[in-house]
Amino acid sequence: MITRLKNWPRLLKTPLQIARHSIQQFSHLAGHYERPPQSGKSSRDPYLVTVVQGRSKKPRFPGERANQRFGEDSWFVRSTPLAEVMGVADGVGGWRDVGVDAGRFAKELMTCCSGQTQRSGFDGRSPRNLLIASFQELTHREHPVVGSSTACLATMHRKDCTLYTANLGDSGFLVVRNGRVLHRSVEQTHDFNTPYQLTVPPEDRKECYYCDKPEMAVSTRHSLLPGDLVLLATDGLFDNMPESMLLKILNGLKERGERDLLQCASQVVEKARELSLNATFQSPFAIKARQHNVSYSGGGKPDDITLILASVEVQSA
C-alpha cells in the first residue's frame, strides 16, 4: 500500500555509507524588511527593495518572526556600504528525532553570516567565502550548536550591479527578468530528500552524519538590470510550487514598492502553503519521489516556507 511519506532521512547516512566514510577518512507571515541607511553609498547606485515572508509548518513559539525564524528555517538581510546581502537556511528536520532543535543551527548560521558582513573589507563579491567564514565561526565556538542546515546566500554588489550567489543543498534562488527565469539554482543532494548540509555533529557520532563543507557550495555570478527580481527560498516553496505557477504570481506585479512586493510574496507563500496541504496535487516533491522510485501517494509536502523577494531599483533622476 502506498502512503504519503511522513519522514525521510535527510540527516543520517546508511550503514554502507558509514562504512565508506570510514574507509575514505584518510583520503506565521513576516513583515517587510526595512533597509537601514548606510554611509558610503552613491545615490545613483542600484539597490534592492527587499521583503521577507514565511510560514511555519506549525506554530512553534510566539515571536519567531522577530527572531528571524519560520519553524526550522532561518534568514537574514543586511545592507552594507558596498553590497546588499541576504540568505536563507533550512534546519534539517531529522535532528528532532534525537531531541535537538532542528532550527537552532540554521538560526545561528544566519546570525554568523549577518555578523560577518559587518567586518572590515567585506565587499560582497564572494558569498561562498562569507559562508566559509561563518561556518568556521560557528564550529570554533567553545560550545558549538549541534545540528545541520542547507544554506543559500546572495549578494548584490552595487557598483557593478552584479549578483553573486553561493548555494549548498536544496534551498535556492531564482533571477527573473521580463517575466522569464534568467537563472535558477540547482539542488545538491546525496539522495532523495537528503540535501547537502553543513553539520556540527555530536562528538561521539561524527561518522554517522553527512558533514558537507561550505567550499562545496555552488557559486554563480549574474549581471542584473533595473527591474530584475531576485528570489531566495527554502525547499518548502520549491517542493510545492511549480515554476510556472510561481512565475504567474510574480508576473502579476505592476509596481515595485515594498507594499507591492510584500503582497506578492504573501500570495506566493500562501499558495505554496495551500499546495503543501493538498493530498492530490502533483507537486514537484511528488514528481521527484516518483523519479527516485520512492513510495509516495502524491500531493504536497507540508514544510516550513521562507521567501526573500527583492527588486533591483535605481534612484530616479
Swiss-Prot record:
List of residues binding Mn(2+) 2: 90, 235
Enzyme class: hydrolase
Record keyword Metal-binding present: yes
Species: Drosophila erecta (Fruit fly)
GO CC field: mitochondrion
Family affiliation: Belongs to the PP2C family.
Residues at which Mn(2+) 1 binds: 90-91
Keyword annotations: Hydrolase, Magnesium, Manganese, Metal-binding, Protein phosphatase
GO BP of this protein: dephosphorylation
EC number: 3.1.3.16
SUPFAM superfamilies reported for this sequence: PP2C-like
Protein name (Swiss-Prot/TrEMBL): Protein phosphatase PTC7 homolog fig
Catalytic reaction equation(s): O-phospho-L-seryl-[protein] + H2O = L-seryl-[protein] + phosphate; O-phospho-L-threonyl-[protein] + H2O = L-threonyl-[protein] + phosphate
GO molecular function terms noted in the UniProt entry: metal ion binding; protein serine/threonine phosphatase activity
